Design a protein with these regions (language model features):
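Gly/Pro-rich hinge or "lid" segments in bacterial periplasmic/extracellular proteins
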Residues: 192, 198-201, 208, 218-222, ...
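Surface-exposed binding/hinge segments that line
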Residues: 157, 278-333
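Append "and occasionally in soluble cytosolic enzymes with long acidic Gly/Pro-rich linkers
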Residues: 105, 131, 224, 453-578
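Aromatic-rich, solvent-exposed beta-strand/loop patch
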Residues: 172, 236, 306-325, 345-396, ...
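N-terminal lobe/hinge region of extracytoplasmic solute-binding protein
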Residues: 144, 152-153, 166, 185-235, ...
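Ligand-site clamp/hinge motif
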Residues: 267, 341-342, 347, 372-419, ...
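Detector for C-terminal structural segments
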Residues: 83-182, 362, 464-503, 568-577, ...
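Aromatic- and charge-enriched surface segment that lines or borders ligand/interaction sites
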Residues: 124, 229-277, 304, 400, ...
Length: 640
């Protein structure tokens, strides 16, 4: 999930649920900001690009050098088949097209992800996920900088707020003593409030406090039953039956039952809705008519789901906002709902199901949520009002917090972090996700290059970035330098951690346990390697008179970098600008407010862009499936 903020968060009085390792969170309140994480994301306009209609094709020869090597080592038969171009197209897999001669052929990746989602051999599945990350990183289009953590400020009298590893913040069971109102800042104007259409972390935080699903996360970060009181899974793991609680209501007092989930899940998964997260419903089998194999009992008390293959993270999906129920009557009563599926919740007063309902919304200024008396746990909700300040100005947010006008602030100005490290109201918690920058593979930046040259160019530019400087001087809260896209701490599905060397898989840089060494000590070696890769890409270098190699005037590099206007994101861009200037490459920075930035990035109107992804659940497939051709989160335009 896309993060909106760049820094970090911890609760002193808040229960923090931390993964094995972390990274640095984005600035929570920017009018832009990502990312869930982090993130981080997207409210951008059109979601999933529909798979093109041609029959899926030859898998890419040479899909990646890493793929070939993996196959040669015999890591998995599937890996070998992908590398050799022998994988038959998978039914339902995305169909990739190359709109740029410099873009990688992406059908082999689409097919591999489809195989990962259907295999029942967990060891083979893990090997194929490593193969997929190899293919992804070989393109050079994804440039990890650090693994997320999160920072925030919270008044000492406030307790009961808790967070999970994925950036969600739960306010419904907060306690502020005699106070019944919490004044909060998460971010600027939210892009979408429809749980099915949201793809940003700040939007998810609003969703988890105003809607509910079959499952949720408790204060310990564990899956707990929510609207479902219990569930049963079949012995083969292919069927789940949930029994819903009695007396569930929408906020308008109408009944809520299993039929609402049948409607909502099919809506979220349909191409007509255009949800960025439609692909997350892929584990669910389809009926002959193409709808999800999800059935409500006649009395609406039970919901039965049949899966394509066993899915170890299925309960996590049931706790994810895209899987929440939405009120069909309200959705379809909105003017223009067929062309604008989110029209029903673009103003205050819409029907919801969680602890709070949106009472008022002054766009770009404030939102007020009030307690929902029809919430099934209403007697446990002590805070009557949540008043959100909508702003991306971290200086103004920090001033409001210090003036006593905010109880919770999800961002801190970069230049204030050092002074807050010992403040009990300042919290740093781990997230499970990666802050990264991305290249548009169809950008004119790569015009006239082969896919191999474009890859070398991107990988060379990546090695120019001083990640240590970014973390030490901008993040400042102990973020871990990133050299993989799948973050440190993510499980492998077999009881271990994915990011490690073992008998079955070794990373290209075995010592650094990743695809390169991001440390300060490796910078000189990385610079030399970057220049060699850029030469492979066709760039010429000359001596600058001081013994340094710089780009020749005959082969300049001019890149446009887009970011939202949060101060930390801009600071990261400026740091990279200086890194690129060391060899004479020019990076022009364009900043926009959050929603404009999201739309530009989703539309592919960029050379290079800031990005961030907080995991939606603890499995590498979440970091990998987002890059298939028709994924609504495929911002780099693979296969398009």
């Amino acid at each position: 999930m896309k993060r909106k903020t760049l820094m970090a968060i911890t609760l002193a009085t808040v229960t923090a649920i931390a993964p094995a390792s972390a990274a640095f969170a984005e600035e929570a309140t920017e009018a832009a900001t990502e990312a869930a994480t982090e993130a981080a994301t997207e409210a951008a306009t059109e979601a999933a690009t529909e798979a093109a209609t041609e029959a899926a094709t030859e898998a890419a020869e040479d899909s990646t050098e890493a793929a070939t090597e993996a196959a040669a080592e015999g890591e998995t038969e599937a890996a070998a088949e992908v590398a050799d171009g022998d994988v038959a197209p998978i039914e339902g897999a995305d169909v990739a097209h190359k709109s740029s001669e410099a873009a990688p052929d992406w059908q082999a990746y689409n097919n591999l992800i489809a195989q990962i989602k259907t295999t029942t051999d967990m060891a083979e599945r893990e090997a194929m996920m490593h193969q997929a990350e190899d293919m992804l990183m070989e393109t050079g289009a994804i440039v990890p900088l650090y693994y997320y953590n999160d920072i925030y400020l919270q008044k000492e009298n406030v307790t009961g707020i808790y967070c999970n590893n994925y950036g969600f913040k739960y306010f419904q069971f907060a306690d502020a003593g005699d106070a019944t109102t919490l004044r909060l800042n998460l971010a600027s104007e939210p892009d979408k409030l429809d749980p099915a259409l949201n793809s940003t972390v700040d939007g998810a935080c609003l969703a988890v406090n105003s809607f509910d699903g079959l499952c949720t996360y408790d204060e310990n970060g564990e899956i707990a039953m929510d609207f479902a009181e219990s569930y049963e899974a079949s012995e083969d793991g292919l069927s789940y039956t949930f029994t819903l609680r009695d007396g569930l209501k929408w906020s308008d007092g109408t009944d809520l039952n299993a039929n609402d989930f049948v409607y909502s899940w099919n809506r979220a998964a349909s191409a007509e809705t255009g949800a960025d997260y439609a692909y997350m419903f892929d584990p669910i089998a389809r009926k002959d008519d193409g709808t999800l194999d999800v059935t409500a009992s006649e009395d609406g008390k039970t919901l039965t789901i049949n899966l394509v293959s066993p899915c170890a993270y299925f309960l996590d999906l049931c706790a994810f906002p895209a899987f929440y129920a939405v009120p069909q009557a309200s959705v379809e009563a909105a003017d223009g709902w067929q062309d604008n599926p989110g029209a029903w919740c673009q103003e205050a007063g819409f029907v919801s199901s969680g602890a709070y309902t949106l009472e008022s919304w002054t766009h770009n200024e404030s939102m007020v949520y009030v307690k929902n008396p029809n919430y099934y746990r209403a007697d446990e909700v002590k805070i009557e009002r949540l008043e959100f300040m909508l702003s991306a100005d971290d200086t103004a947010i920090y001033a409001a917090y210090n003036a006593g006008d905010l109880d919770f602030a999800d961002t801190v100005p970069t230049d204030e972090i050092q002074s807050l490290l010992d403040n009990p109201e300042f919290h740093i918690i781990d997230n499970l996700g990666t802050y990264y920058v991305a290249f548009n593979v169809n950008s004119n930046l790569f015009a006239g290059k082969t896919p191999e040259q474009a890859s070398a160019m991107r990988r060379g530019l990546s090695l120019l970035i001083d990640r240590d400087y970014i973390v030490e001087n901008i993040g400042q809260t102990g973020q871990q330098l990133a050299n993989t896209f799948v973050p440190a701490g993510m499980a492998d599905g077999n009881g271990g951690e994915f990011r490690q060397n073992d008998d079955a898989y070794t990373y290209p840089d075995a010592d650094a346990v990743g695809y390169y060494d991001p440390s300060y000590e490796a910078y000189d070696d990385n610079l030399a390697q970057a220049i060699e890769l850029l030469k492979e890409a066709g760039y010429e270098f000359v001596d600058d008179g001081n013994g340094n190699e710089v780009l020749s005037d005959a082969t300049p590099i001019d890149i446009t970098y887009i970011t939202n206007d949060g101060s930390a994101h801009v600071a990261v861009a400026e740091a990279m600008q200086q890194d690129f200037a060391a060899i004479g490459a020019n990076l022009t920075i364009e900043t926009n407010e959050w929603n404009v930035f999201l739309n530009e990035r989703k539309a592919g109107n960029f050379d290079m862009s800031r990005n961030g992804w907080l995991a939606d659940f603890n499995d590498p497939i979440n970091m990998l499936e987002m890059w298939t051709t028709d994924s609504g989160n495929n911002d780099v335009q693979f296969g398009r």
